[in-house]
Amino acid sequence: MEKVLCKDIMKGETYWELYRCTERMNFDSTEKLKKKNKEVIKYLSKLKDSGRSEEAIMLFKKDQIAWKNYVVHRCAYKGHSYDKDSYVYFSNKDLCEAVENYRRIESLDGELNIP
């Protein structure tokens, strides 16, 4: 049975449900991305070419840093019109980061035949 991430909190009664759900989505996507990053590094560490493994891991880590920078700026841009102290701002930020994390996971799934 497939687990629905926010089923237990989404009753359709308050905005708080939405805020909690986006927070949960961000946490879930962050944990899944951390796991995927570990899988990628493990895969890259097994490359047979001497010295290529370390270079590949270093380049992947740099790519990940650049991607995180993209997410920070992308989500700041998408939420620039909201009051920075509002729940709407934080919910929008959480949702944006979660979406980008899930996209990154999909992207990594398709690279280098990484399982």
Located regions from the model:
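N-terminal alpha-helical modules
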Residues: 1-115
